[in-house]
Swiss-Prot record:
Residues 62-79, 220-229, 255-264 have a biased composition (Polar residues). Interacts with melt. Pfam families: Forkhead. InterPro entries: Fork_head_dom, TF_fork_head_CS_2, WH-like_DNA-bd_sf, WH_DNA-bd_sf. The lineage of its organism: Eukaryota, Metazoa, Ecdysozoa, Arthropoda, Hexapoda. The gene is foxo. Transcription factor involved in the regulation of the insulin signaling pathway. Consistently activates both the downstream target Thor\d4EBP and the feedback control target InR. Involved in negative regulation of the cell cycle, modulating cell growth and proliferation. In response to cellular stresses, such as nutrient deprivation or increased levels of reactive oxygen species, foxo is activated and inhibits growth through the action of target genes such as Thor. It is found in: Cytoplasm; Nucleus. Residues 38-89, 181-204, 216-264, 316-358 are annotated as: Disordered. Residues 94-200 bind DNA. Residues 326-335 have a biased composition (Pro residues). SUPFAM superfamilies: Winged helix' DNA-binding domain (SSF46785). CDD domains: FH_FOXO (cd20032). GO terms for biological process: cell differentiation; glucose homeostasis; negative regulation of cell growth; negative regulation of cell population proliferation; negative regulation of insulin receptor signaling pathway; regulation of DNA-templated transcription; regulation of lipid metabolic process. This is Forkhead box protein O.
Length: 609
């Protein structure tokens, strides 16, 4: 009873009430009585008394004591708890050592510090009592599989190829492995201490940048419920930034602060949009448009892509009014001006009344064909109109246009809503002025093109057409004309064109040098009509065709002469070979006749009468 603090209590009576002294002499005592072996599932964990102290293990493994301490001894309790936490491990059937510890002992006990897999199995059976009766093939499949698993899993074991052929590899201890509890290979790709340090430094750098930009950037877009992580995400190392950090959209949020997890933190005030949403009115009192953003918008709207898009829309919207003869000429396209002073001077949006001309273009005029339908253009244009742009529904430059009832309703709604802020109204008027000036000039260009297309072709006079820098690629024209085989007729009654004909050399003509025959230019002194030019072209084509025919005939004649020469050569060779063959045949016949002369029968046959 060395392992117990006190002796087990003695039982005086059994469950049936019989005294233990009465049963002591009747029971046979076996001196060699040993505990019977049980299955592993019933072996551990075994129930132990509360004051049990475990004895020392065979393999010098230590385990903290589970003995309860007195409540007053707090210092000793803390030390025992730390020791128990440090040395605690899962208790196996053979002790506290794991499979990796047993394999380490096996390899370390070898003379050359290396063992094969079969030698490790043998060491387990010989040195660990639990595996002594489990060396056969039936009961060793489980623990042998665990040993193979631990050999390939832990970093402390290293596989070395065996020098002999057909032999298993050696397993050795890795000298570079870290001491203590080994790190599994599967966990090596996960977060390590080095990765944690690097990520921590990156977090600190980002937090410092956020704190530095809170004062300047958070004031630009005020939001009562927005946080730094939601509105001030910077990437200083990004190649996109120039000068300052690249700021993401204020609506962007990280995964941790998504809309689903931070519904109460969303701001009721919309963030600043570079492109306004035409379906909803924009609150200009809560947003500030910088001059850089305004210039970027003006440059974007002045590109050719926007011109083509707006021109297409204007052609669709004003197709009904393109044939009106009473329309005045439209002004050319003028790029938007950036100076604020000029914008205020040229602004048609004054509180007194609208300015005359094209500046009072109404958005309702863009949907003349959609007037009878439920078009969305009407409703989208209502939100961005000022009172001055809505009052005048008929422009003096367009006497045929119809007044719109929708614009009057919109104006009444604006008046009933109350007076707006003067500063916000000025900003809104300036932006609408820029947009409408662009649409007006583009509309004028498109309508001018449509009106020009409506004119008859007879009014087009080439004499009044400026031909100072007019040039024509004659080579492409001639090639296209020749591709039709000379059947294309050009009978357009146009005026004369100043031409300069460059005469070609006296040599043979070809398609490559036809381009040198004519060069239309404004500096020429001779005038030829289009019919004369067509006649010259046909004549040149005929000459070129004749020249090609002559060349083809010459080539054919040369080919025939070459064939005749070949035939003559073949005939000469054939005659000589024929003579030689005839001589050979004649000599053979003579020899045969001489050989067969003695056997010639001179008498007639018997049946001849």
């Amino acid at each position: 009873m060395d392992g117990y603090a006190q002796e087990w209590p003695r039982l005086t009576h059994t469950d049936n009430g019989l005294a233990m002294d009465q049963l002591g002499g009747d029971l046979p005592l076996d001196v060699g009585f040993e505990p019977q072996t049980r299955a592993r599932s019933n072996t551990w964990p075994c129930p132990r008394p509360e004051n049990f102290v475990e004895p020392t293990d065979e393999l010098d493994s230590t385990k903290a004591s589970n003995q309860q301490l007195a409540p007053g001894d707090s210092q000793q309790a803390i030390q025992n708890a730390n020791a128990a936490k440090k040395n605690s491990s899962r208790r196996n059937a053979w002790g506290n050592l794991s499979y990796a510890d047993l394999i380490t002992h096996a390899i370390g006990s070898a003379a050359d510090k290396r063992l094969t897999l079969s030698q490790i199995y043998e060491w387990m059976v010989q040195n660990v009592p639990y595996f002594k009766d489990k060396g056969d093939s039936n009961s060793s499949a489980g623990w042998k599989n665990s040993i193979r698993h631990n050999l390939s899993l832990h970093n402390r074991f290293m596989r070395v190829q065996n020098e002999g052929t057909g032999k298993s590899s050696w397993w050795m201890l890795n000298p570079e492995a870290k001491p203590g509890k080994s790190v599994r290979r599967r966990a090596a790709s996960m977060e390590t201490s080095r990765y944690e340090k690097r990520r921590g430094r990156a977090k600190k750098r980002v937090e410092a940048l956020r704190q530095a930009g809170v004062v300047g950037l958070n004031d630009a877009t005020p939001s009562p419920s927005s946080s730094v992580s939601e509105g001030l995400d910077h990437f200083p190392e990004s190649p996109l930034h120039s000068g300052g950090g690249f700021q993401l959209s204020p609506d962007f949020r990280q995964r941790a602060s998504s809309n689903a997890s931070s519904c109460g933190r969303l701001s009721p005030i919309r963030a600043l949009d570079l492109e306004p949403d035409w379906g909803f009115p924009v609150d200009y009192q809560n947003t500030t448009m910088t001059q850089a953003h305004a210039q970027a918008l003006e440059e974007l709207t002045g590109t050719m892509a926007d011109e083509l898009t707006l021109c297409t829309q204007q052609q669709q919207g004003f197709s009904a009014a393109s044939g009106l003869p009473s329309q005045p000429p439209h002004p050319p396209y003028q790029p938007p001006q950036h100076q604020q002073g000029q914008q205020q001077q040229q602004s048609p949006y004054a509180l007194n009344g609208p300015a005359p001309g094209y500046n009072t273009l109404q958005p309702q005029s863009q949907c003349l064909l959609h007037r009878s339908l439920n078009c969305s253009c009407m409703h989208n244009a209502r939100d961005g109109l000022s009172p001055n742009s809505v009052t005048t529904t008929m422009s003096p430059a367009y006497p045929n246009s119809e007044p719109s009832s929708d614009s009057l309703n919109t104006y009444s709604n604006v008046v009933l809503d109350g007076p707006a802020d003067t500063a916000a109204l000025m900003v809104q008027q300036q932006q609408q002025q820029q947009q409408q000036q662009m649409s007006t000039s583009l509309e004028g260009q498109c309508l001018e093109v449509l009106n020009n297309e409506a004119q008859p072709i007879d009014e087009f006079n080439l004499e009044n057409f400026p031909v100072g820098n007019l040039e024509c690629n004659v080579e492409e024209l001639l090639q296209q004309e020749m591709s039709y085989g000379g059947l294309l007729d050009i009978n357009i009654p146009l005026a004369t064109v100043n031409t300069n004909v460059v005469n070609s050399s006296s040599g043979p003509l070809s398609i490559s040098n036809i381009s040198n025959l004519s060069n239309i230019s404004s500096n020429s002194g001779s005038s030829l009509s289009l019919n004369q030019l067509q006649a010259q072209l046909q004549q040149q084509q005929q000459q070129a065709q004749q020249q090609q025919q002559q060349q083809a005939q010459q080539q054919q004649q040369q080919h025939q002469q070459h064939q005749q020469q070949l035939l003559l050569n073949n005939n000469n060779n054939g005659s000589s070979s024929l003579e030689l063959a005839t001589q050979t045949v004649s000599t053979n016949l003579n020899a045969r006749v001489q050989y067969s002369q003695p056997s010639v029968v001179t008498s007639p046959p018997s049946w001849v009468h």
